[in-house]
Amino acid sequence: MSDDDERGEEYLFKIVIIGDSAVGKSNLLTRYARNEFNPNSKATIGVEFQTQSMLIDGKEVKAQIWDTAGQERFRAVTSAYYRGAVGALVVYDITRSSTFENVGRWLDELNTHSDTTVAKMLIGNKCDLESIRAVSVEEGKSLAESEGLFFMETSALDSTNVKTAFEMVIREIYSNISRKQLNSDSYKEELTVNRVSLVKNENEGTKTFSCCSR
């Protein structure tokens, strides 16, 4: 048996990070992918992505995480950005209520351009700035519950909950995929298009709710 056979099936999941400009999307990604933080990071134009791997049930799971990298300033995020996404982090800045108020628009756009089974997490970023908080934990939690989302507060600056948030979404994607029936021709075609290798898992995952309390 080859090493590849012993390692088992490989998965590739596309995850998108969405939200208003300057909420910290790029810093969340670089903190998770490279454990780096740049306080002077500037919005760039285009789409960037990082790939991270983790093991779930003995299988290698790769998450290809896409960042809008400034496109949202021009409302130019299109269906191409969402195509094939099986997970999404919707980010707002806890110090700017307008970014929280715009979460609904981002969710509408996500729901328009993606499958209803996308694993979604609402992220209240910059929880290190407690002294100038404008959106309470309770408000974030309430919105997440009403929309059926996971919820967590994070800080790209000090790493609070960053790894936990990404890995929770990745695990939820794996659970969602494992529950899907593979005997549908249309579903098999979808897997081929999205480049996601899947197997049926006997253990069904249970969705949990989590938030950061300070």
UniProtKB/Swiss-Prot annotation:
**Cellular component terms (Gene Ontology):** Golgi membrane; Golgi stack; Golgi-associated vesicle; plasma membrane; trans-Golgi network
Q: Where is this motif: Effector region?
A: 41-49
Which Pfam families would you find in this protein's record? Ras
- Give GO MF terms, alphabetically: GTP binding; GTPase activity
Q: Which domain of life is it from?
A: Eukaryota
Annotated residues that bind GTP are located at 19-26, 67-71, 125-128, 155-156
User: What are the alphabetically sorted keywords of the record?
Assistant: Cell membrane, Golgi apparatus, GTP-binding, Lipoprotein, Membrane, Nucleotide-binding, Prenylation
Function noted in UniProt: Intracellular vesicle trafficking and protein transport. Binds GTP and GDP and possesses intrinsic GTPase activity.
Q: What is this protein called?
A: Ras-related protein RABA5c
| Organism in which the protein naturally occurs | Arabidopsis thaliana (Mouse-ear cress)
Q: Which gene is transcribed and translated to give this protein?
A: RABA5C
